[in-house]
Regions:
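Short beta-strand immediately N-terminal to the catalytic nucleophile in serine-hydrolase-like folds
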Residues: 68, 86-88, 113
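Conserved acidic catalytic loop of the alpha/beta-hydrolase fold
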Residues: 66-84
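Gly/Ala-rich beta-loop-alpha elbow adjacent to hydrolase catalytic centers
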Residues: 88-92, 96
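Residue in the alpha/beta-hydrolase core beta-strand immediately N-terminal to the catalytic nucleophile
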Residues: 49, 85, 108-111
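Conserved donor sugar-nucleotide recognition element shared by glycan-biosynthetic enzymes
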Residues: 64-72, 123, 142
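Flexible "cap/lid" loop of the alpha/beta hydrolase fold
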Residues: 97-102, 106-138
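Conserved HGGG/HGGXW glycine-rich cap/lid loop of the alpha/beta-hydrolase fold
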Residues: 7-61, 75
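Conserved alpha/beta-hydrolase catalytic His-Asp/Glu region
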Residues: 121-126, 139-186
Length: 186
């Protein structure tokens, strides 16, 4: 596996075959797709940490869906990928739908997990609240956000029986830089 840093964006490139590009959700990282890697063993898998997320360096300037789309196009150009299968989760599904409109020739197929066209109004309100908490309280705010998301996103049974899943989600969210997380929420 090769790890690249293109314009402050961390990109993992592994395997050979048709390109499959994975785009994580809010608070996620390229590691979100680790469980899929055995099934994709015959593919070239590109896993990107979106600007301001996970191992990507702090994003300068605005963070937006349009910026994420531009980033994906730039990464594909740098890696000589003319067409790819795309896999997205949550926020990543919004990004990929926009990519399909902006650069349809780049998209061989889409696999969308937890797809959204845009967050509904109640979710937008919750995202603004998360942004304010992350920005004003920093790491303590991220801890509180993480605990709330763990309780909302994982069942009590999962939280009890699968501590590794809980640890993975907690680690993914707690590794986000609070200001960049806030800007992504907005």
């Amino acid at each position: 596996m090769a790890l690249h840093l293109f314009e402050r964006v961390a990109v993992e490139d592994e395997g050979e075959g048709e390109a499959v590009v994975c785009v994580h959700g809010l608070g996620g990282s390229s590691n979100s797709f680790t469980p899929l890697m055995p099934a994709l063993a015959r593919q070239r898998v590109i896993r990107i940490d979106l600007p301001g997320s996970a191992r990507s360096q702090r994003a300068e300037g605005p963070i937006s869906i349009a910026r994420f789309v531009d980033t994906l196009q730039s990464v594909c150009a740098r890696l000589n990928i003319a067409r790819a299968h795309w896999v997205g989760h949550s926020l990543g599904t919004i990004v990929l739908q926009n990519l399909a409109v902006a650069a349809p020739k780049l998209v061989r197929s889409l696999a969308l997990f937890g797809p959204l066209i845009t967050p509904p109004d109640p979710a937008r309100t919750a995202l603004r609240s998360r942004a304010a908490k992350a920005r004003s309280e920093g790491l303590a705010g991220m801890h509180e956000i993480t605990q709330a998301l763990l309780n909302a996103a994982l069942s009590a049974d999962t939280r009890q029986r699968q501590p590794l899943a809980v640890a993975f989600v907690r680690e993914s969210l707690m590794r986000q830089e609070p200001e960049c997380y806030a800007r992504t929420c907005e």
